[in-house]
Amino acid sequence: VPDLSAAARVDHWPDQTPFHLILSDGVNPDGSPWMACLRALLRNALDALREEFDLSVLSAFEQEFYLNGLTDLPGANYSLIAHQLAADFGAQVIAVLRAAGQEPETFEPEGGPAQYEVNCRPALGLRGADRALIVREIVRDVARRNGCRATFTPVIAEVGFSNGVHVHLSLQDSAGRPRTYDP
């Protein structure tokens, strides 16, 4: 069942067909939740956390990927040069994510050749996980439209840097007060 609250539209290129992504919940033919639907499982866990402890999860994901098809300069890892090589691509990713309501914060080079990371603002509950999926699909779409290929595959070679995802979580109560903050 499509969830219109988990939708994103990419309409950045006027001469190309827009990309409209809507995440969905898996259901059985009778309409009951499918037992292996990850969104339903997460929703149930978040509901239990809220009901039992009055807590909600705020999450953000740092997602690393390799951009195949981009000119690379060996040894430019984490550098301004690596950033400049992907400046147009990075600007497009940020613009498209912003237009799609994903609240991007950073696009930056990582440790591997032609490896980059994209980060968005934290989101509450299921929206945080949905955002992680939507961001990946938008990055892939922007890469494809630029004649490149973005891969989030963890290990793409026997040696070198792998892609990772850093998940930042915090808990807050129903009043929005942080519960994991320790001054």
Question: Model-found features: residue ranges?
Answer:
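Glycine-rich, acidic/polar active-site loops that bind/position phosphate-bearing ligands
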Residues: 1-183
